[in-house]
Swiss-Prot record:
<keyword id="KW-0333">Golgi apparatus</keyword>
<dbReference type="GO" id="GO:0005794">
    <property type="term" value="C:Golgi apparatus"/>
</dbReference>
<dbReference type="GO" id="GO:0042995">
    <property type="term" value="C:cell projection"/>
</dbReference>
<feature type="region of interest" description="Interaction with ARHGAP17, DAAM1, DIAPH1 and DIAPH2">
    <location>
        <begin position="546"/>
        <end position="601"/>
    </location>
</feature>
<feature type="region of interest" description="Interaction with DNM2 and WASL">
    <location>
        <begin position="487"/>
        <end position="541"/>
    </location>
</feature>
<dbReference type="InterPro" id="IPR031160">
    <property type="entry name" value="F_BAR"/>
</dbReference>
<feature type="modified residue" description="Phosphoserine">
    <location>
        <position position="351"/>
    </location>
</feature>
<dbReference type="GO" id="GO:0007165">
    <property type="term" value="P:signal transduction"/>
</dbReference>
<feature type="coiled-coil region">
    <location>
        <begin position="388"/>
        <end position="481"/>
    </location>
</feature>
<dbReference type="GO" id="GO:0005856">
    <property type="term" value="C:cytoskeleton"/>
</dbReference>
<feature type="region of interest" description="Interaction with PDE6G">
    <location>
        <begin position="293"/>
        <end position="601"/>
    </location>
</feature>
<feature type="site" description="Mediates end-to-end attachment of dimers">
    <location>
        <position position="166"/>
    </location>
</feature>
<keyword id="KW-1003">Cell membrane</keyword>
<keyword id="KW-0458">Lysosome</keyword>
<feature type="region of interest" description="Interaction with DNM1 and WASL">
    <location>
        <begin position="529"/>
        <end position="601"/>
    </location>
</feature>
<keyword id="KW-0446">Lipid-binding</keyword>
<feature type="domain" description="SH3">
    <location>
        <begin position="540"/>
        <end position="601"/>
    </location>
</feature>
Amino acid sequence: MDWGTELWDQFEVLERHTQWGLDLLDRYVKFVKERTEVEQAYAKQLRSLVKKYLPKRPAKDDPESKFSQQQSFVQILQEVNDFAGQRELVAENLSVRVCLELTKYSQEMKQERKMHFQEGRRAQQQLENGFKQLENSKRKFERDCREAEKAAQTAERLDQDINATKADVEKAKQQAHLRSHMAEESKNEYAAQLQRFNRDQAHFYFSQMPQIFDKLQDMDERRATRLGAGYGLLSEAELEVVPIIAKCLEGMKVAANAVDPKNDSQVLIELHKSGFARPGDVEFEDFSQPMNRAPSDSSLGTPSDGRPELRGPGRSRTKRWPFGKKNKPRPPPLSPLGGPVPSALPNGPPSPRSGRDPLAILSEISKSVKPRLASFRSLRGSRGTVVTEDFSHLPPEQQRKRLQQQLEERSRELQKEVDQREALKKMKDVYEKTPQMGDPASLEPQITETLSNIERLKLEVQKYEAWLAEAESRVLSNRGDSLSRHARPPDPPTSAPPDSSSNSASQDTKESSEEPPSEESQDTPIYTEFDEDFEEEPTSPIGHCVAIYHFEGSSEGTISMAEGEDLSLMEEDKGDGWTRVRRKEGGEGYVPTSYLRVTLN
């Protein structure tokens, strides 16, 4: 069944139907285009979301990246990013294979439809013109027949009229004959026109228009087939990415199963274990018998041997609670000469410094200045720690681990250089045996450089081994002190003996005398040691930065800067949003990190 046979008289219906089919094709293309925009926006939002939650710092600089929870989260973000890439691929396939191709095909269909309907309308116009000619010849034949009949009646009436002349009768007969001849010609022309029209009409309805309708039917069926294929492309584009999306989902599942709480707990220990010994028991201080002190007892506390008692900074400071807030350390109160504050008693004895040897006084000043400078340095270290090569700024356990890492890295580099030296030696032997392969002298600079690197790395390995051994011994001693301290039962805080103050003083003196003197105190003269303590520790910039915005720096600890000003970076942001910088004309302070463009050395 075809349109040319069954719908031979439904030209307008076919015109509307084919137009509806093309409109449907355009609507589907528009739908897919909007679907593509949705996919692209979805993928863009997913990528923005992933970028928002990805860690800003590199994994090697981020301690949190060592936890399995963080690693799984980063892996999930990467899988989501891959998923977004698949959504972009779906959008691209739909845009190219559906939107572009169907739009081009729709334009071709519209041109073909226009051509077929123009051909049909042209055939209709030709048939209408033939019908008009048939009507004209028919009306002419009808008019000529009436006039011929009228002329024949006139000639017959004159022929019967006795008053009519012979000339009038002859004229009427000639007129009747002429009209009869004209009617006969009109009849023949009408018959020929009718025959021609019937032939054209039969050709129009049985051949010409059915062919046009069949072409329209074929065009519409091809359009429907292509549209159905376009419907299938919508699902095929999804099915093509299903395996990769399934891998993304499987990766998310693997990341979820990779969370290891026990390992994270161990990682936290590895990252933050200090290696310090636990604090010992707080000693009981008896203030109930202040009058039993010796008259010569002062802030320096002269023991029985006549030497002034000097308490170290660790004994005079408030006990540090490890779980409390980290307050800034304050320097111990000092007298104008650098010693402890004299006794507050108005009638107290004079200071034992009077009549002392000046060298002894200078020695006491040097020893008392050390805690003060140490407290100032610890105060500055609370704002920005100076990193040392032996990692002595870290707690013992962390120092040991960092030294172990550095030692392993240097050992690997040393082994690499040794292997390279062996390879160069073999290559040199080959060149010496077969000179056409190369000049042995050309390898001498590389061999020399390799030997220099080996010597340098050996020295570094020895240096780190010594530091590591010292750090390990320190960790072991801290562990031993902690165990022995906890094994000793605490002293009862009740019923102290009357001479507890003198006992504690003598005990402190005994403990201080049992401590081995350092190499610095043995070899360095007192005046040199005193001068070195007052020297400012140099701090070199770790980078430079440029001020993006103007900052007033009105609050305490901050510094003002102008927009575009070049500054030296002294300390990175510790997570509080502030960075310590130094101006070229002098002066250091903190400025907002978001106001800077930072470049590390």
